Regions:
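N-terminal and secondary-structure boundary signal
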Residues: 1-179
Length: 179
């Protein structure tokens, strides 16, 4: 976290003005918290291999569609929760519903990023978990600046975005979109 504070402080300070909102990607927060794991070091169990076979593959990213990312979901969220989420998804898929696995598994599962070719090395060969304590991180970053700004930790991808943490609990997507 200390390195993140130095980098954000040094490079954002000259550009920030009162009233600004500083977006910080969840991936860099998680990496600085030590929540990135080389794919070669993740040893999936049989359950991870089985469950990953049922994940819908999309052009938007690997998600939990590889055994290593599914293994990290099992560790991060707990095996019972992931099995329950898989069961719910299997049932609701029959009715044409999508996304129920991630809704039940929760934000920790949704926040897991697998390796992709467009990620900056060496993290193109890592599994990155979601950040811990994103609200606290946003508040710590806000405290760096002698300006009236807000900081949000976001997870934004091709499918949409989520505010994971904010220095201002009143700041929501709806309020932000009005800016």
């Amino acid at each position: 976290m200390i390195r993140l504070i130095f980098v954000v402080g040094e490079f954002a300070t000259p550009f920030l003005q009162d009233g600004d909102i500083l977006f910080v990607t969840e991936k860099i927060v998680a990496i600085t918290q030590g929540r990135a794991y080389p794919i070669k070091d993740v040893k999936p169990r049989k359950l991870a291999y089985t469950l990953s076979n049922y994940v819908t593959k999309t052009p938007h990213g690997i998600g939990l569609g590889m055994p290593e990312t599914m293994e990290m979901a099992l560790r991060e969220c707990g095996t019972p929760r992931i099995i329950f989420a898989a069961g719910v998804a299997a049932i609701t898929k029959v009715f044409g519903r999508k996304g129920d696995f991630y809704r039940v598994a929760g934000y920790k599962a949704r926040s897991i990023d697998g390796p992709t070719s467009h990620t900056i090395p060496p993290y193109n060969e890592y599994v990155v978990l979601g950040p811990e304590r994103p609200n606290e991180v946003a508040k710590e970053l806000k405290a760096l600046f002698d300006k009236d700004i807000d900081v949000i930790v976001v997870d934004i991808n091709d499918l949409g975005g989520n505010i994971l943490g904010s220095s201002n609990s009143q700041l929501t997507w709806t309020k932000w979109l009005k800016y």
